[in-house]
């Protein structure tokens, strides 16, 4: 049964209001709350003894969505989930994931998940994963997502990962392997506050000729929170890779950004950029002259930066 709290979480992490259109799997407190397959997208449980689902998308599937959100509303729930995606050839699909935790108790609630994508020739996947935590209990809210992607010739993925607010601890691991003419674009947006801690390890291997990879990371660290970023692009052939990390630091927060590029071919073209700084005083002043308070001006700037 979907409660009012559950519905609020689903809207925040997956923009869902009511029953989703198309294929979907809603996981709640380590169980399957609802599931639906379509003619072109099949969702099945993992074999016995392994938690998670298997999503198979038929060749030529275009314009369809698949929603697979996870919500935890009971304090003390911890889980390890494995989701495998098999995308056929010549597809163009949207996959919306995400996890929301409401913890009003004193025990830790944690979701660890491994998503593995096998994207076939000339297929395009848009993948969105949002994380959000709330609740007035003392129990922590923890998420540790691992995403692994294999892109065949001409395949591509646009991946957007967002941590909205309220996650006490997270370790994100992402690895993408690109074949010939494949393309990976990863946009990461992260907000931490209080004493939260976030780590993100990301690696894109450009193995095939004319493979392309881009990482765009934008983060805000407030209060006494800590962030560590380690994006890596490895060029093993004629390829192009670009890493861009921009962070705003506030209060007594700490940010460590360690972008790395490795070229194992003379035809690899790789670029990395990293910047950490505070909000510029002239930006705040300009907004305050328009009638905003300092707090409202800060909030407006941060929303624009993370948009």
Segments (PLM) and residue ranges:
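Conserved beta-strand/loop scaffold segments within soluble protein domains that form the structured core
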Residues: 23-28, 33-285, 289-292, 302-307
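C-terminal functional modules
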Residues: 1-25, 30
């Amino acid at each position: 049964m979907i409660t009012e709290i559950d519905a609020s979480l689903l809207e925040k992490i997956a923009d869902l209001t009511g029953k989703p259109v198309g294929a979907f799997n809603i996981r709640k407190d380590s169980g399957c709350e609802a599931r639906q397959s379509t003619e072109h997208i099949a969702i099945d449980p993992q074999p016995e003894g392994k938690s998670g689902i298997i999503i198979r998308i038929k060749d030529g599937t275009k314009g369809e969505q698949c929603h697979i959100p996870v919500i935890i509303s009971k304090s003390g729930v911890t889980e390890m989930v494995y989701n495998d995606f098999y995308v056929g050839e010549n597809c163009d699909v949207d996959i919306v994931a995400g996890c929301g935790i409401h913890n009003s108790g004193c025990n830790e609630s944690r979701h660890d998940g491994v998503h593995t994508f096998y994207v076939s020739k000339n297929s395009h996947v848009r993948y969105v994963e949002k994380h959000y935590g709330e609740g007035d209990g003392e129990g922590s809210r923890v998420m540790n997502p691992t995403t692994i992607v294999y892109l065949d010739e001409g395949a591509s993925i646009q991946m957007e990962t967002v941590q909205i607010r309220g996650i006490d601890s997270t370790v994100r691991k992402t690895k993408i392997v690109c074949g010939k003419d494949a393309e990976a674009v990863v946009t990461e947006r992260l907000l931490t506050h209080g004493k939260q801690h976030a780590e993100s390890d990301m690696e894109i291997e450009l193995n095939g000729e004319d493979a392309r990879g881009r990482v765009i990371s934008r983060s805000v660290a407030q209060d006494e929170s800590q962030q560590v970023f380690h994006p890596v692009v490895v060029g093993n052939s004629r390829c192009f890779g670009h890493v861009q990390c921009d962070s705003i630091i506030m209060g007594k927060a700490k940010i460590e950004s360690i972008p790395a590029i490795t070229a194992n071919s003379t035809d690899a073209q790789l670029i990395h950029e990293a910047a950490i700084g505070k909000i510029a005083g002239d930006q705040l002043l300009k907004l305050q002259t328009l009638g905003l308070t300092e707090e409202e001006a800060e909030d407006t700037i941060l929303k624009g930066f993370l948009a």
